[in-house]
């Protein structure tokens, strides 16, 4: 495949760019920077994911939506088509009640848009393989960042098999190294850098519903949810006909399950339809082999330091995984940055990136928190389903005006903060309309009573 290099309008200068983190966002950013003609060094503290069976500590599948698809498409390398060729479309949520009965909530009854379940490892491999085709990208695996002097553009890395560190220098350092970003830890020390983090009291464990006779055990084209008030379970389909199951519960509930008998009793009570699909022996093995993982939300700003350093993806805005937007938001970071670099000099582009992105990043972090409450509890309520039906009806009538919150987040590139603003005016309009009906109803009732008494 031939690689076409593009030029930035902001500057003709070619820079040496160091990207820390070769995950989904880091490898995508490397491709965009390389297409501009920059010399890119991509550093990853893990070994090459293409030589590993699993990506340790990370969910093995993800939900790809419009923002991520746009980032893949704009590269012009055919990556979106390659991803979708093996991805599994999910057209809605399938809700499992405590009796094992199911109901379906379609994401987009109007335009039939859907999410796509993609394998993290497969997508990462695809991006890294694309990086290999660029002569101006060099990948450095087993390089853990230990020091960063962003003012001087100096980096130091540690390798697992060597006592001596590796030193590097770059014109621009880009941190794509996740929620526990080593580069961000260096930026925190600089004046004017604001940072907050919040752990939630919920942990998660990953389980598996295996394939049976090489077929899915549940309908594959849905995100499956078992809402149970203050805890829940979800399942996404995999390409091998299995489902990755995520059990999310408060840590005290995890701690209360001390032995296999209590675990089977718990699943019999709360997830009776899932238990035979997972299998008792496999459930016991998977549940007790690891401790539940913590979840946190991170907000920080600014995302840049002068024209020297920048944070993207989870390094800039880690979020809980319940809106399926972590990867998509990170990829959208890259497309926004790319558009600014096409128009502005580097330092101005980085400043504009922070200015244009921070409110949207904060917004999606908040939405992810909200969606956890929705998925575990609100989806069971009749009020939620009525609102969903009303949103769908209004969306059919006014598709350019009345875009439901979930649709605007998942199926458009509307800024996240505007998605929230839209939802607020929709809520206000519905509430005022509801109050108007009450006032009119009371007026009609009062008039009828008056007419009956005094005619």
Curated annotation (Swiss-Prot):
InterPro entries: FAD-bd, FAD/NAD-bd_sf, Kynurenine_monooxygenase. Pathway: Cofactor biosynthesis; NAD(+) biosynthesis; quinolinate from L-kynurenine: step 1/3. The keyword Lyase does not apply. One of its GO terms (cellular component) is mitochondrial outer membrane. Keywords: FAD, Flavoprotein, Membrane, Mitochondrion, Monooxygenase, NADP, Oxidoreductase, Pyridine nucleotide biosynthesis, Transmembrane, Transmembrane helix. It comes from the Eukaryota. The chain crosses the membrane at residues 393-416, 429-453. The keyword NADP applies. It is a multi-pass membrane protein. Belongs to the aromatic-ring hydroxylase family. KMO subfamily. Catalyzes the hydroxylation of L-kynurenine (L-Kyn) to form 3-hydroxy-L-kynurenine (L-3OHKyn). Required for synthesis of quinolinic acid. This is Kynurenine 3-monooxygenase. The lineage of its organism: Eukaryota, Metazoa, Ecdysozoa, Arthropoda, Hexapoda.
């Amino acid at each position: 495949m031939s690689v076409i290099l593009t030029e930035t309008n902001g500057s003709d200068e070619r820079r040496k760019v160091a990207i820390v983190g070769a995950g989904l966002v880091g490898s995508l950013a490397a491709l965009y920077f390389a297409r501009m003609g920059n010399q890119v060094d991509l550093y990853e503290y893990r070994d090459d994911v293409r030589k590993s069976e699993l990506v340790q500590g990370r969910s093995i599948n993800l939900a790809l939506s419009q923002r991520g698809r746009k980032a893949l498409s704009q590269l012009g390398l055919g990556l979106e088509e390659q991803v979708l060729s093996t991805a599994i479309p999910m057209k809605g949520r399938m809700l499992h009640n405590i009796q094992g009965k199911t109901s379906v909530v379609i994401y987009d009854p109007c335009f039939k848009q859907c999410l796509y379940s993609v394998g993290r490892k497969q997508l990462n491999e695809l991006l890294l393989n694309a990086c290999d085709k660029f002569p101006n990208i060099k990948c450095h695996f087993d390089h853990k960042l230990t020091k960063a002097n962003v003012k001087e553009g100096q980096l130091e890395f540690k390798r697992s098999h060597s006592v001596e560190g590796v030193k590097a220098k770059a014109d621009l350092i880009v941190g794509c190294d996740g929620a526990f970003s080593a580069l961000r830890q260096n930026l925190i020390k600089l004046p004017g850098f604001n940072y907050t983090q919040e752990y939630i009291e919920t942990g998660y464990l990953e389980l598996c519903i295996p394939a049976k006779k090489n077929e899915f055990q549940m309908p594959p084209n849905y995100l499956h949810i078992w809402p149970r008030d203050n805890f829940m379970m979800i399942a996404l389909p995999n390409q091998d006909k299995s489902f990755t199951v995520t059990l999310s519960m408060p840590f005290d509930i995890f701690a209360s399950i001390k032995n296999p008998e209590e675990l089977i009793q718990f699943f019999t009570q709360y997830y009776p339809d899932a238990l035979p699909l997972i299998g008792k022996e496999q459930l016991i093995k998977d549940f007790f082999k690891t401790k539940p993982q913590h979840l946190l939300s991170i907000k920080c700003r600014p995302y840049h330091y002068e024209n020297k350093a920048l944070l993207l993806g989870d390094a800039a805005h880690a979020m809980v995984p319940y809106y399926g937007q972590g990867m998509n938001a990170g990829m959208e970071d890259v497309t926004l940055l790319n558009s600014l670099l096409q128009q502005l000099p580097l330092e101005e582009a980085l400043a504009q990136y922070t200015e244009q992105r921070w409110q949207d990043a904060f917004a999606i972090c908040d939405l992810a928190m909200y969606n956890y409450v929705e998925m575990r509890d609100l989806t069971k309520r009749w009020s939620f389903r009525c609102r969903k039906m009303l949103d769908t009806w209004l969306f059919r009538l006014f598709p350019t005006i009345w875009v439901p919150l979930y649709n605007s987040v998942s199926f458009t590139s509307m800024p996240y903060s505007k998605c929230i603003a839209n939802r607020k005016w929709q809520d206000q309009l519905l509430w005022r309309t509801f109050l108007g009906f009450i006032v009119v109803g009371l007026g009609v009732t009062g008039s009828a009573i008056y007419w009956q008494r005094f005619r």
